[in-house]
Regions:
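Proline-centered flexible-loop/turn and helix-kink motifs
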Residues: 27, 33, 86-87, 159
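Histidine/acidic-residue-rich catalytic or RNA/ligand-binding cores of hydrolases
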Residues: 21, 49-56, 96-115, 151-158, ...
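Mid-to-C-terminal alpha-helical segments outside catalytic/metal-binding sites
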Residues: 79-80, 88, 99, 126, ...
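Active-site gating/metal-coordination segments in enzymes
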Residues: 1-79
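Active-site beta-loop-alpha junctions enriched in small/polar residues
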Residues: 13-16, 42-46, 95-98, 145-147, ...
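Aromatic-lined glycan-binding groove of carbohydrate-active enzymes
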Residues: 43, 78-82, 86-133, 137
């Protein structure tokens, strides 16, 4: 993939009705790890049962396209894939970032009891560290919307160095002035703005 100029590989939050961590994909992940490329999890209608629920584009965006972010996060972070592949970097793109508070909170609630359960431990699919440690490890990135009112809280959760710039351009809900919106925000420091608009993309993808 490097010889053809790839700077990241892109997947959806699930592979059909299977999580990204499903054992049938182990050989694929082993081979991908050898490339050294970062992984981008992209918004999309990847989980077929959701299509039975939605009837409008709004429902599709919020449910069928949005909820696979949580499914992908559970697979990659909560089921130990970042432990099995210690050089893997992961970004969640076009999902926004509000969803992260819910899934991190739920995992923090359930994981302590699961770690005490020998039958769960025997499956070998629990993360070795606290979830918060992965968020600030330099290997996990999110892409909030430029006008996200929770951006300061998201920075507090993952660190400013893990926030990627997002505009959704040229989608219908995209923002053609997203960079200006970041620059004009009064709740970010100049250093945080530079990190979001430039430095963090280099951290994730490498220098252009």
């Amino acid at each position: 993939m490097h010889p053809i100029g790839a700077s990241t590989a892109v997947v959806f939050g699930t592979v059909g009705e299977r999580l990204l961590s499903h054992k049938s994909f182990t050989a694929i992940w082993d081979e991908f790890a050898r490339t050294g490329l970062p992984l981008s999890v992209h918004m999309g209608r990847s989980y077929p049962p959701f299509d039975q629920l939605v009837e409008t584009r709004l429902e599709a965006h919020v449910i069928a396209m949005g909820m696979p972010a949580q499914l992908g996060f559970v697979a990659l972070v909560a089921q130990g894939m970042l432990d099995r592949y210690p050089d893997l970097k992961v970004a969640f793109l076009e999902f926004g970032a509000e969803w992260l508070f819910y899934v991190v909170g739920r995992l923090a609630h359930y994981l302590p009891s699961y770690r005490r359960d020998p039958t769960v431990r025997a499956m070998g699919r629990l993360p070795e560290k606290a979830i918060e440690e992965y968020l600030t490890s330099g290997r996990f990135f999110i892409a909030p919307e430029a006008d996200d009112p929770l951006l300061p809280q998201e920075i507090a959760l993952v660190g400013a160095e893990h926030i990627l710039f997002s505009s959704d351009y040229p989608h219908g809900e995209g923002r053609d002035n997203a960079a200006s919106e970041i620059l004009q925000r009064g709740d970010l420091t100049d250093g945080q703005k530079r990190s979001i608009l430039f430095d963090n993309t280099v951290r994730f993808c490498g220098a252009p």
